[in-house]
Amino acid sequence: MLSYFIPTAKGLAPLLEVELKEMGIENPQQMNGGVKFEGTLEQGYKVCLWSRFASRVLLKLSEFKVLDSMDLYLGCSNIPWETHFDVDKTFSIDFSGTNDEIRNTQFGALKIKDAIVDRFRKHFDERPNVQKRDADIRFNGRLWKDKATIYLDLSGSPLHLRGYRTIAGEAPLRETLAAGIIKRSGWQGEALLDPMCGSGTLVIEAAMMALNIAPGSLRETFGFEKWKKHDQECWQTLKTSAQVYGRRAVNQCETRFYGSDLSKDMIEIARKNAQRAGVGEVIEFSVTDAKKVLPPEELETGMLITNPPYGERLGSFSDTITLYTELGYHFKDAFAGWNLSMFAMDTELLSCLGMRAGKSFKFFNGPIECVLKNYRISPKRPAVEVEPVAPKKTNKETPEPINPWTMGQNESVVEAAIENESELVFKEVQQIKPAIYAEEFANRLLKNLKQLEKWAKREGVECYRLYDADLPEYNVAIDRYAEYIIIQEYRAPKEIETQKVRRRFLDVVSTVRYVLNLPDDKLVIKVRERQKGRQQYEKLDTKKQSLVVHEGQAKMLVNLQDYLDTGLFLDHRPTRLLIGNMAKGKDFLNLFCYTATASVHAALGGAKSTTSVDMSKTYLAWGEDNFAENGIKGKHEFIQQDCIKWLQHAHEMYDLIFIDPPTFSNSKRMNDVFDVQEDHVALLTSASQRLNKQGEIIFSNNKRGFKLDVDAIKALGFYIKDISQSSIPEDFRRNKKIHQCWILTKHTD
């Protein structure tokens, strides 16, 4: 009998052991890094041909004790290498393991190479050549403590290289790992769909299983073909049997397979891979966004299985969280009654799906530890009229979920729920407490909600800040926009470990969803630097989904997805309302107007005219849309220009001017760099020249530590009134340095 060691990726050894038993191999045993067994040459060939989980097939040639490099050399010198390959063939050595004397794998491989070369020279006066890539024959040395084992690699190139994938996408799954994922998913032959299929590996491997295609039958070469003891007749018999008798006819396959991806190029690659694998006729590929893919109409159930991109592939961890959260929403809505198997970088990411998993399995995708979790997506229940259940007082330490989104529908019940921190249960929304739950953060969130909801209801405030890095460990801002919640992650300092930052952010997402009992599609996640003023108008996406929110008598269009900012600066809510009260009968100028929300309030407050100036064409158009949303007509002008440059050439006079400049700006459209601390006097000087007698300027900025040059401003003929404290709304009281604000009134003399 021959001795074999079959290495495999971490997490696949149990599957490999079962697979070997199914091949008729007796007593396979798991060991570190793989499975070993005693068997025939035919069985070694069979593993090369049929194993879906093996990385290589290693035939043991010798095993001996090694205390130092000389022991390794002498032990290898005693192996009859000439009985395994001829001197005119090339060879290569793979070596793994170290001990106290052999501390480098390259050194270990070099000693084996020296022993082989010296033995050939001794017997034939010639030596074979080493070829690291595509060698005729490959050997493997493994050192464990004081024992070395030398193997012949029957597989040659790794067995995950099936032969059908000539082009792969970014960070592709190895075929062996894909097969393991499918096996662990619990798939029983039902329809299978991968909504992010990339180059198609998962769906192709599943189809090959269904058609009983031997994974090794597509390979052109194996490592044993130049081996002197190779039994060609035995190998050809096995290969013919696999090709002729083992494969089921395509027309007999009842299972249907579907693969979709957002990339047209990847789908084209996947189609070609499937054709090469012989499964192209049973797989239907399409170019579709995973968040929009739908099950085939005729299928009421099936298997969703996928490997979504990791944060490194997406570009940011926040993007990954957003993707997983949106996938959870969509899968629960569109694939009710299906099974779902998700392969991901970590358990915390999968918590963003908002589903409770059944079984989970640990794998490694190369060096990255990953997890596979299996879910049953509950079938949709018939729609029923829902009545809230009255809350019951609770003494539990852990706060139960409440539902603030029903405010106004059943106010007494909601108020009681907030007051008692008890559960507001809706039959259609049943939140299960997540595995990841930050209790301290949850308590602070509930405390803020309790304080702010009554205020918001009393003041008619629809959009407000619920949390703003109140606890240093949870460095996020959480805003409510009507029925939506936005979680904005502040970028952590470099000295904080990335893994710790990721874990805390996932704590936040999971806890917010549970505590607020959020409906499935009402959570938006963003990442941003801590703002320095209002300069960070970076575009994030192109969804162009607008939401109408109310502020006083005004209606505002906000965009929760496409930009870091939404179009409405919440901290300046009192300032905008103040402008509405001050603007009646006045000509109003709004510099650095952003989306012209202050101009909307001025117009609705009875301003004679409004002029809104900003460099951004996008935000000015947004401002015009805000005016249209409110049905505002009359003398209202929108000017796209550098505000500082425009002031230098303007001739119109105004009664009320609002100036809320960025902290810093070096836009390409500006001739000079703007710094609010250094340049505010010059800015206010220019603005004062456009001000009528008894006119007023409301000046504000967000620069931390900003110092108004009082003497210079007074010299311009202004009375100065600091309204910073009164201009900070209730929801920003926890951060009283969010902005500073002054009313500058021109002397009458």
From Swiss-Prot:
Keywords annotated in UniProt: Cytoplasm, Methyltransferase, RNA-binding, rRNA processing, S-adenosyl-L-methionine, Transferase
Any one GO cellular component localisation term in the record: cytoplasm
Domain of life: Bacteria
EC number: 2.1.1.173, 2.1.1.264
InterPro entries the record matches: 23SrRNA_methyltr_KL, DNA_methylase_N6_adenine_CS, RlmKL-like_Mtase, RlmKL-like_Mtase_CS, RlmL_1st, SAM-dep_methyl-trfase, SAM-dependent_MTases_sf, THUMP_dom
Localization: Cytoplasm
Annotated TM spans: none
GO MF annotation list: 23S rRNA (guanine(2445)-N(2))-methyltransferase activity; RNA binding; rRNA (guanine-N7-)-methyltransferase activity
UniProt-annotated stretches for the region Disordered: 386-406
Residue ranges occupied by any THUMP domain in the UniProt entry: 43-154
Catalytic activity: guanosine(2445) in 23S rRNA + S-adenosyl-L-methionine = N(2)-methylguanosine(2445) in 23S rRNA + S-adenosyl-L-homocysteine + H(+); guanosine(2069) in 23S rRNA + S-adenosyl-L-methionine = N(2)-methylguanosine(2069) in 23S rRNA + S-adenosyl-L-homocysteine + H(+)
PANTHER family according to UniProt: RIBOSOMAL RNA LARGE SUBUNIT METHYLTRANSFERASE K/L, RIBOSOMAL RNA LARGE SUBUNIT METHYLTRANSFERASE K_L
Family as reported in the entry's similarity comment: Belongs to the methyltransferase superfamily. RlmKL family.
Function: Specifically methylates the guanine in position 2445 (m2G2445) and the guanine in position 2069 (m7G2069) of 23S rRNA.
The protein's name in its UniProt record: Ribosomal RNA large subunit methyltransferase K/L
Source organism (scientific name): Psychromonas ingrahamii (strain DSM 17664 / CCUG 51855 / 37)
Gene: rlmL
